[in-house]
C-alpha cells in the first residue's frame, strides 16, 4: 500500500489523460491590436473579371505597411465534393429545402503570395487561399495569405464587425463595403502561464488538477486518496476518473489533450511514415446551428464563410499529410433559435441552454444517426463557453458510429466556434485532434515533464517547449501557419499503426466533391485521366497535361498520382506498391495492367501470429490484450510487467495492471479493432461483438477440461461414498425393543374446569394431571372400535 500510495501521483499524471476518446478544447484568440485597410486591389485579367475556373493574379497595397502584394491564384476544387449538397432545416429540425452546391457559384482559389521589392521584382513569401466575393473594377475577397510565416487575414468590413469584440481594434465607419487585413502578429500576445491560470480558475475543465500529481501530499490528492471507498478487492478495477475526480475531457487551456497511444513522440518527429504516399481526400460534413446562422445576414454569406474556412485550413493538411479536406455535406439551420431544442437536432439551441461540452455530446448522437461515410462532422456555432471556442473527440477519424458510457457520446465529431481572428486555425486545430494529434508542449506541460510520457509533442528531441509556433498549440497565437514536425510524426504514425482509422479517406481518383469535376484541383474526377493541380503545381510533369487533365501522348498513367506507375507506364506485375508493415499486414503488388495499387489487406482478425503464445492478428497488427497494455500503459509507467486484467476480458476498454500497481486501472482507451474479447468475440470501436458460450468453451478448453475433471472426480467420490455407506448400513442388524402390551382404551377427559392458564396449571392454579403417555414409535398399530 505504501508503494501504491507513492506511485499514484505519477500514475495519474501518466494515465489520467490517456483517452483516445478524450475531448480537447480550444482557447479564444487574443485581441486584435491593429487592422490595416486593403486598398487598390486589381484583378489582372483583361476584363478584371474571373469565373470559378480562372487562373489569375490580384495585386493590392497595404499603405500603412508600405507593402505591395501580389497573389498568384488558381482554382481550388478540392474542398467541394461532386455530390455535395446543402440542406436547410426549419425550427423543428425538419429538412424543408435541399439543393446541390453548384461549383460555378463559388470562386475559391489557392496559390502563393509575393512581395514587391524596391527594384520592382517580386519575391515569393508564402501561400494564399482566397474566396472572391465580387470581381470587376472594385473587387472584394476574403481569405488568408502569409508573408514570411506571418498569416494575414483578409475580411470584409461587415465580416469583421460581426465578430468584433470590445477589445479588438476599431475600423473606419464607411457606408460602402471594403476589405481589412490583420496579422497574427497584430494579436496581443499575453503571457500564457498567467492567462491559463486565470482561465482555468473559471473553467469547468478538470485538467488543472494535474498539478497535484508531482506532490503526494497535495491536499486534493490526499483527500481523494484517503476518502475514496474502493468497495472492491485489490483486483477490482479502479477508474482513474473516480480515483482522482478527473474528467475524460481535457481542456486545451490546461495544456494536455490526450496521449499518443504509447508511442514515444520524440522518436517520430518529422516522420511521414504512415501518411499516404499519393494524395488522398478527407470529405467532411459541416452543420451550422442557429447562433452561427444568426451571425450572418443571409444563408449565402454563412455558406461562403464556411467554404472559405475549409479552403484556408486544407492547405496545411495538404502540405503536411498529403491529405486535402473537402466539403461534402452542409446543413444549415434557421437563424431564429427554437425555445426548446427539437428532438431531431438537439444540438440546435440558444447559447444559454447548453455549454460547448453538451453540444459536442448532442452533436455526436446526431452524427451517429446520419447515413454517410464522411471522415468526420464539424458543428459550427457562435456559442463559446467562457474562453473555449473549440472541442473535439481525439482520434475519431472515420468513426461514423456513436458510442458512450451514458455521460459521453463519442463519434467522429468536433465543435468550432466562430471567432474574431484565426477562425480557420481553430477548425484546423480541432480537425487535428480528430486525426489523433495531441497538443504541442508548452511551458506548463514541460514543467510537468509530460513530454516524457508523450502527452504533448516536444519541439525536438532536445527541447520540450514548442513556444506556441504551431497549429496544435493549446491556444492561438502569432505566426501559427503549420503543423509542428512532432505533430506530423504523431498523426502519420497513428495512421500507419491503424490506431486512427483511415479507411474513409478517398483515393485521388473518381472522387465526388461538392464543386463538381474541375480540371486543376489536384483531384482526379469523373472524365479526367489525371489532375496534377494546375499549371503552377504540375511543373514539368511528363505524364499529365495540366490544361486538359488528359494524359500526354504515350502516357497511360501519372507517376505523381498512381502507385503502380513508372515513367508514365504501368509498373510490372509483382512490383511492391504497398510494403508489409508486419506479419499480419499483407504486402500489395501491382497487377501489371492497372496503375492502382490493390486495396490494403490484412490477415484475418484472430489468426495466430508471432513466436509468443497468445498473440493474434488485429487490424493488421500482431498483438494481444497483454501486449497492448504493455505498449500503452507500460511505456508510460516504465513497467514491462503490465498486463490486461483477466477478470475484464469481455471489455474492449484497456483495463491494465501490474505486480507493482496491484490494482486494475481503467485508462479510457480502447483495444484495437479485432482484439479478442469475451467468449470468442472481437473488439469493434470499443464494443465486444460476436461473443458466445460455445466460443468461450473453445477458447478456454484447458480451463473447461480442468474444471470438468475436477467436478467429475468429486461426483465419482460422492457416489463411492454413498455406496460404501449403504453397504455398511446393510450389514448392521437393527434390534427392536420388546412390544408393550395394549394399555386399554383411553380414559375419559377430565371435567371442564375453565381456561387453561399455563403450563401444567389448571383453573384456579390447581396442578393438572399430565396426559397419558403416547405409544412409542415401535408399538404396533392400535385399533379403535
UniProtKB/Swiss-Prot annotation:
GO CC term (a single one): membrane
Stored Pfam families: ADAMTS_CR_2 (PF17771), Disintegrin (PF00200), Reprolysin_5 (PF13688)
Extracellular side: 27-703
Region of interest called Disordered, as start-end residue ranges on this chain: 737-785
The protein's role, per its UniProt record: Probable zinc protease.
Positions glycosylated per UniProt: 322, 329, 355, 561, 593, 640
One GO BP: proteolysis
Domain Peptidase M12B: from-to ranges: 279-507
Name the record gives this protein: Disintegrin and metalloproteinase domain-containing protein B
SUPFAM superfamilies: Blood coagulation inhibitor (disintegrin), Metalloproteases ('zincins'), catalytic domain
Positions bound to Zn(2+): 429, 433, 439
Signal peptide boundaries: 1-26
Amino acid at each position: 500500500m505504501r508503494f501504491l500510495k507513492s506511485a499514484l501521483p505519477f500514475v495519474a499524471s501518466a494515465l489520467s489523460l490517456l483517452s483516445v476518446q478524450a475531448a480537447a478544447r480550444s482557447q479564444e484568440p487574443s485581441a486584435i491590436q491593429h487592422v490595416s485597410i486593403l486598398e487598390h486591389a486589381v484583378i489582372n485579367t483583361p476584363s478584371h473579371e474571373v469565373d470559378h475556373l480562372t487562373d489569375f493574379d490580384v495585386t493590392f497595397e497595404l499603405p500603412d505597411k508600405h507593402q505591395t502584394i501580389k497573389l498568384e491564384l488558381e482554382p481550388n476544387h478540392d474542398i467541394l465534393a461532386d455530390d455535395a449538397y446543402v440542406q436547410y432545416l426549419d425550427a423543428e429540425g425538419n429538412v424543408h429545402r435541399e439543393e446541390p452546391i453548384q461549383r460555378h457559384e463559388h470562386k475559391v482559389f489557392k496559390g502563393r503570395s509575393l512581395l514587391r521589392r524596391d527594384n520592382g521584382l517580386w519575391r515569393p513569401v508564402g501561400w494564399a487561399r482566397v474566396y472572391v466575393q465580387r470581381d470587376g473594377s472594385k473587387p472584394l475577397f476574403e481569405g488568408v495569405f502569409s508573408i514570411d510565416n506571418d498569416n494575414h487575414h483578409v475580411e470584409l468590413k461587415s465580416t469583421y464587425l460581426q465578430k468584433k469584440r470590445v477589445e479588438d481594434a476599431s475600423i473606419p465607419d464607411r457606408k460602402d463595403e471594403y476589405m481589412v487585413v490583420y496579422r497574427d502578429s497584430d494579436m496581443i500576445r499575453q503571457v500564457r502561464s498567467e492567462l491559463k491560470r486565470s482561465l482555468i480558475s473559471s473553467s469547468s475543465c478538470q485538467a488543472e488538477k494535474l498539478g497535484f500529481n508531482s506532490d503526494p501530499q497535495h491536499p486534493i490528492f490526499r483527500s481523494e486518496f484517503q476518502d475514496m471507498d474502493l468497495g472492491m478487492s485489490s483486483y477490482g478495477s479502479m477508474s482513474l476518473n473516480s480515483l482522482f475526480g478527473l474528467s475524460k475531457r481535457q481542456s486545451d487551456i490546461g495544456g494536455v489533450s490526450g496521449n499518443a497511444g504509447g508511442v514515444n513522440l520524440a522518436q517520430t518527429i518529422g516522420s511521414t511514415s504512415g501518411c499516404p504516399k499519393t494524395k488522398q481526400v478527407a470529405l467532411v460534413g459541416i452543420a451550422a446551428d442557429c447562433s452561427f446562422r444568426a451571425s450572418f445576414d443571409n444563408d449565402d454569406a454563412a455558406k461562403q464563410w464556411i467554404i472559405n474556412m475549409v479552403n484556408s485550413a486544407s492547405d496545411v493538411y495538404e502540405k503536411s499529410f498529403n491529405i486535402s479536406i473537402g466539403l461534402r455535406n452542409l446543413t444549415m439551420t434557421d437563424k431564429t433559435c427554437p425555445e426548446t431544442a427539437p428532438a431531431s437536432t438537439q444540438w440546435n439551441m440558444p447559447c444559454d441552454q447548453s455549454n460547448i461540452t453538451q453540444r459536442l455530446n448532442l452533436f455526436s448522437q446526431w452524427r451517429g444517426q446520419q447515413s454517410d461515410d464522411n471522415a468526420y462532422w464539424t458543428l459550427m456555432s457562435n456559442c463559446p463557453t467562457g474562453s473555449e471556442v473549440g472541442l473535439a473527440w481525439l482520434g475519431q477519424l472515420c468513426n461514423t458510429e456513436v458510442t458512450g458510457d451514458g455521460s459521453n457520446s463519442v463519434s467522429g465529431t468536433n465543435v468550432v466556434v466562430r471567432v474574431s481572428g484565426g477562425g480557420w486555425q481553430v477548425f484546423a486545430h480541432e480537425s487535428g485532434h480528430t486525426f489523433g494529434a495531441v497538443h504541442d508542449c508548452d511551458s506548463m506541460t514541460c514543467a510537468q515533464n509530460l513530454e516524457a510520457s508523450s502527452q504533448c509533442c516536444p519541439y525536438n528531441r532536445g527541447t520540450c517547449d514548442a513556444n506556441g509556433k504551431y497549429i496544435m498549440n493549446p491556444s492561438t497565437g502569432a505566426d501559427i501557419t503549420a503543423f509542428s514536425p512532432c505533430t506530423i510524426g504523431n498523426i502519420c504514425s497513428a495512421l500507419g499503426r491503424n490506431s486512427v482509422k483511415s479507411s474513409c479517406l478517398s483515393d485521388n481518383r473518381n472522387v465526388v466533391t461538392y464543386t463538381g469535376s474541375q480540371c486543376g484541383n489536384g483531384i482526379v474526377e469523373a472524365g479526367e485521366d489525371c489532375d496534377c493541380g494546375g499549371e503552377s503545381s504540375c511543373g514539368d510533369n511528363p505524364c499529365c497535361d495540366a490544361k486538359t487533365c488528359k494524359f500526354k501522348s504515350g502516357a497511360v498513367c501519372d507517376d505523381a498520382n498512381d502507385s503502380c506507375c513508372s515513367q508514365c507506364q504501368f509498373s510490372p506485375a509483382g512490383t511492391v506498391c504497398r510494403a508489409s508493415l508486419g506479419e499480419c499486414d499483407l504486402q500489395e503488388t501491382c497487377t501489371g495492367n492497372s496503375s492502382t495499387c490493390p486495396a490494403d489487406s490484412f490477415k484475418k482478425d484472430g489468426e495466430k501470429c508471432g513466436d509468443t503464445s497468445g498473440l493474434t492478428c488485429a487490424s493488421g497488427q500482431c498483438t494481444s490484450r497483454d501486449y497492448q497494455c504493455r505498449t500503452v500503459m507500460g511505456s508510460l509507467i516504465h513497467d514491462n510487467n503490465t498486463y490486461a486484467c483477466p477478470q475484464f476480458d469481455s471489455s474492449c476498454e484497456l483495463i491494465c495492471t501490474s505486480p507493482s500497481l496491484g490494482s486494475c486501472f481503467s485508462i479510457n482507451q480502447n483495444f484495437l479493432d479485432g482484439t479478442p474479447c469475451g467468449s470468442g468475440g472481437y473488439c469493434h470501436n470499443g464494443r465486444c461483438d460476436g461473443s458466445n458460450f460455445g466460443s468461450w468453451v473453445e477458447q478456454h478448453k484447458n480451463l473447461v477440461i480442468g474444471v470438468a475433471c475436477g467436478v467429475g472426480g468429486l461426483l465419482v467420490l460422492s457416489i463411492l461414498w454413498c455406496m460404501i455407506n449403504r453397504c455398511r448400513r446393510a450389514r448392521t442388524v437393527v434390534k427392536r425393543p420388546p412390544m408393550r402390551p395394549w394399555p386399554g382404551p383411553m380414559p375419559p377427559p377430565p371435567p371442564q374446569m375453565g381456561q387453561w392458564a399455563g403450563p401444567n396449571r389448571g383453573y384456579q392454579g390447581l396442578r393438572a394431571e399430565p396426559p397419558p403417555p403416547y405409544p412409542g414409535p415401535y408399538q404396533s398399530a392400535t385399533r379403535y372400535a
